[in-house]
Structure formats: C-alpha cells, structure tokens
C-alpha cells in the first residue's frame, strides 16, 4: 500500500515506452522506482506534489516485472527481476547508480522479489516460474551468498516474509526468538497452494514448516504476511479463483492455520497489508481496490471501495 497518507499522486509522463508492471516507493517515500515491459527501470525523486525522473536503469533482456527497495540501513539498494530470469541488485552512491550483483541461475521468469525485515539480515527472496525460490544474502564481507530450492512444481508467483518478531513476543514476559531464528516466508504457486518456509541453520537452506495450505482452486497470484506482531499471525492469499483467503495462526500453536474466505466476482491479483497490519487491500481484474478490516466478532468487513 502507498506510504503517502493523503491524496493520490499521478505521474502522467512516466517515460516508459510500454506497460508498467510495478511502482514502489522507498522507505522514506522520497523515491519511486517503476519497471516496464520496455526492459527498463526508472527512478523518480518525489518532492511534495512534484516528481522528477532522475535515472533510467537498463540491463534486463525482457519485461521487468518487479522492483523492491532494501531497508535504508543497507544503503540505497534496489532489486529488480524480470522475464529474462535474472535478478539484478542496483546501488546508488553519491548520485550515481551501478549494478552491483547479477543472479542468473533461474531457468524461467522471476516474478517477484521481496526483501526480508531488516532485523533478519540483508536477505532477498526471489520467486520464479521455474518452480524454485532463491534467497540471496549480502554478507558482512561485501560478498553475496545464495540458496536455491524447489518450491512449487508448476511455478512460484509470490513470496512474502514473516515479521522478524514472533506474534505475542512483545506482550509476553519471555523474549521472542533471535531475529535470524525467525527467517520465515510464505510462497504462493500455480499449484493452487501456499507453503510456509523456515530457515534451517544446520543445512543452510529453507524447509517447509508444515504441509501446504490448500483450498484455492486456481493459481495463487499473491501472498502477504501481515507485519503485525501482536496476538496472531495473519497471511492473506489472492487467487484467480475469485477468493481471498485470510489465514490466522495463534502463538500457542504456530503450525495450525485457520482460514476465512472472502468471495469476489473477478480474478484477484494482489493483496497488501497496511503498515500497522490491520487493513487489507485487495485488487483484481475488475479495476477496483477494496479495503478490509476485521471486526470484534472476527469477521472481515469491506470498509472502502476505490474505483478507477
């Protein structure tokens, strides 16, 4: 969801020559990165109601599907991924952008890249149509390490990290696990399932935490793990089957996930939580965005509809 509190800002001249697939504000809301089928990434400086194109990044050999900013504690770093199966890491230093790392081991389109919460380290998860997920890690000695593993045989469409802090840990007397011990994320695939993965230090890879979450009857297009760290864990999943499923887990039994289903009249593409984790935005092929909140009875209500 946008980090701007009020109003919508429209960039009428994006500079792109083809369809735009992603547009993401940085942590401070001062820079906007966009990517397109024209194979480029563009960086805009945002100042109040005005914006200025400052850089065009080139290097991908096909459509660029996704861009994602790292946390500013790691510098001005941007990841991009595209149809060419490549993941690029870009860095801006003293006003100049450069490509500091290329990852090209995926055998098909890389659909989504997602940075982990900064407390867990400088980690980037990448979801690919080749059925695998890779996790890139920037090490203290300025080198990059990676793991890559099969996730969904028919292709991986989405990935979302869990909060670095476990639910309930900030309100309980005993401390939560160390940040690196909570390296967990959820993936959504073309096999209609969600899978939750946890880092295993003994093997230096990620293993499925439990059996897949099932119920969708078509591709899972997006997953979003709520950033809230209060009483429960929440995961939202959006599917081409016209439903959003909201999965909840209690800290007392973290491997058990309950599900509530929201029904829509169209295929769904994206789900996104607010920064506080209590509002869910849903968008699909009907060109609407709906906002949902959980009421005191535990039911989900649509509180706003935004139409183009």
From Swiss-Prot:
What gene is this protein translated from?
SEC13
Q: Which family does it belong to?
A: Belongs to the WD repeat SEC13 family.
Q: Where are the WD repeats?
A: 15-54, 59-100, 105-146, 151-207, 215-257, 263-302
Q: What InterPro entries does the annotation carry?
A: G-protein_beta_WD-40_rep, Sec13/Seh1_fam, WD40/YVTN_repeat-like_dom_sf, WD40_repeat_dom_sf, WD40_rpt
UniProt KW keywords: mRNA transport, Nuclear pore complex, Nucleus, Protein transport, Repeat, Translocation, Transport, WD repeat
- Gene Ontology MF terms: structural molecule activity
Q: What is this protein called?
A: Protein transport protein SEC13
Primary residence: nucleus
Q: Where in the cell is it found?
A: Nucleus, Nuclear pore complex
- The protein's organism comes out as Chaetomium thermophilum (strain DSM 1495 / CBS 144.50 / IMI 039719)
On assembly, the entry states:
The COPII coat is composed of at least 5 proteins: the SEC23/24 complex, the SEC13/31 complex, and the protein SAR1. Component of the nuclear pore complex (NPC). NPC constitutes the exclusive means of nucleocytoplasmic transport. NPCs allow the passive diffusion of ions and small molecules and the active, nuclear transport receptor-mediated bidirectional transport of macromolecules such as proteins, RNAs, ribonucleoparticles (RNPs), and ribosomal subunits across the nuclear envelope. Due to its 8-fold rotational symmetry, all subunits are present with 8 copies or multiples thereof.
Q: What Gene Ontology cellular-component terms does the record carry? A: COPII vesicle coat; nuclear pore outer ring
Q: Which GO terms describe its biological process?
A: COPII-coated vesicle budding; mRNA transport; positive regulation of TOR signaling; protein exit from endoplasmic reticulum; protein import into nucleus
Q: What is the role of this chain?
A: Component of the coat protein complex II (COPII) which promotes the formation of transport vesicles from the endoplasmic reticulum (ER). The coat has two main functions, the physical deformation of the endoplasmic reticulum membrane into vesicles and the selection of cargo molecules. It also functions as a component of the nuclear pore complex (NPC). NPC components, collectively referred to as nucleoporins (NUPs), can play the role of both NPC structural components and of docking or interaction partners for transiently associated nuclear transport factors.
């Amino acid at each position: 969801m946008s980090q701007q509190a009020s109003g919508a800002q429209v960039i009428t001249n994006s500079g792109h020559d083809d369809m735009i697939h992603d547009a993401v504000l940085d942590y401070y809301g001062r820079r906007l990165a966009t990517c397109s089928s024209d194979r480029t990434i563009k960086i805009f400086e945002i100042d109040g109601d005005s914006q200025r194109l400052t850089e065009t990044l080139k290097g991908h050999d096909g459509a660029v599907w996704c861009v994602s900013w790292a946390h500013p504690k790691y510098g001005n770093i941007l990841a991009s991924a595209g149809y060419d199966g490549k993941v690029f890491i870009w860095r801006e230093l003293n006003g100049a952008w450069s490509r500091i790392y290329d990852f090209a081991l995926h055998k098909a389109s890389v659909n989504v890249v997602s940075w982990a919460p900064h407390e867990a380290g400088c980690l980037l998860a990448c979801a690919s149509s080749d059925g695998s997920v890779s996790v890139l890690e920037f090490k203290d000695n300025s080198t990059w390490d990676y793991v890559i593993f099969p996730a969904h045989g028919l292709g991986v469409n989405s990935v979302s990290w869990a909060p670095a802090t476990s639910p309930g840990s900030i309100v309980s007397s005993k401390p939560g696990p160390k940040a690196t011990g909570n390296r967990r994320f959820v993936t959504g695939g073309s096999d209609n399932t969600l899978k939750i993965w946890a880092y295993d230090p003994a093997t230096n890879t990620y293993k499925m935490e439990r059996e897949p979450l099932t119920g969708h009857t078509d591709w899972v297009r997006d997953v979003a793990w709520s950033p809230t760290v209060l009483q429960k864990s929440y995961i939202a999943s959006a599917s081409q089957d016209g439903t959003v499923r909201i999965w909840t887990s209690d800290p007392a039994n973290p491997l058990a996930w309950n599900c509530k289903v929201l029904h829509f009249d169209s295929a769904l593409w994206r789900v996104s939580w607010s920064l506080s984790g209590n509002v869910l935005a849903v968008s699909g092929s009907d060109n609407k965005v709906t906002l949902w909140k959980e009421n005191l009875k535990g039911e989900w209500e649509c509180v706003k509809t935004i139409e183009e």
